[in-house]
Amino acid sequence: DLDVGEMYTKTELFFERNKKAFSIAAVGLVAVVAGLLGYRKFVAEPRAESAQEAIWKAQYYFEIDSLDLAINGDGSYPGFLDVASSYGSTPAGELANFYLGVCYHQKGEFETALNYYKEADLDDDVLRVMAEGNQGDALVELGRADEALAHFEKAANMVRSDHTTPMFLMKAGILYTENFSLDGGTATL
């Protein structure tokens, strides 16, 4: 038989005996939450804004096909390498890694491109899928068809899209039929 009064008294005694520990835990929790909020407001957000301001000129050089200037900067403005190394954990820093992958891919430096595609941890669904699929493209160029196939299939299934899903399924199918067996290629499509 459960006595509510006795149970209440035991609970009350437990809290009374451990009041100091509960107070320390509560203060610690408040300090951690305040620290996280402060870090976000006073460190992470300003850093993300600085990164966004730093990347624009490199993006411009990329758009006009000046890959070396996009990668290394022009002396007055940083290139993607500087943005990625200085602001790597920000959205603009992650985007710089993606751009570096594309730049090195276009320059024919496929292993370097592959490394930067892997580094790009992007929030945007389309860019995340493209980074995955572009890894497959770089692996094809490096003659690693089996690894490329896995990346194409992963990219095709990451986010359903009228653009990226059929594109990467087609790449997977073509790669499969050229390097493996026709039956598997048909099954992939």
Where on the chain are the PLM-derived regions?
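N-terminal positive-inside, membrane-proximal cytosolic segments immediately preceding the first
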Residues: 1-28
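Short solvent-exposed coil/turn linkers within tandem alpha-helical repeat scaffolds
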Residues: 21, 45, 84-93, 107, ...
